[in-house]
Amino acid sequence: DIPVEAIKNQINKNLYGEVKILEIEEVGKEFNSRFDAQRRTYLYIMKKKEEITPFEASYIAGIKGRVDGKILEKIMKVYIGKHDFSSFMKKDKALRNTIREIYDVKCVSDENTGEIKIEISGSSFLKTMVRIMVGSALAVYFHERDRDYILKKLKNPDVGGRKILAAPEGLYLYKVDY
């Protein structure tokens, strides 16, 4: 038997700077990393398009203007709770259950860098759900949709309706709790 700490060190020696194993622990053979997760947290980073450097372009989503994190957070708090998120997913005929629970949403503005960081924690997420949630919230923020647009979509799910999709750059699976 190899100690788990030795496995972690060996893996980290072969990884590059962008990926690193922080913690490792032994689990039973029946453990499933996808289905045994209790909480997932996604991080979405964005800033005004004109302020993104060429080095950031693949890692940060560009948006049309500066955003006040407190106002955006207030808009996004409506997602918290257990809802039918079928209006916030890419169509999937095989999927039977579109009920998901969002535990928390945080939006933080960094005045120095102009970045907005959004953390969304939930039980699990549907395909493209986070990008549609962020895209919809930004549409409300920039007055492209009514203030109650998100609430209407949560109360009256519209599977085939047009989705407002935020850019893929800037989206990260940030943390998984077991």
Regions found by a protein language model. Give the residues of each.
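Structured-RNA-binding interfaces characteristic of tRNA pseudouridine synthases
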Residues: D1-Y178
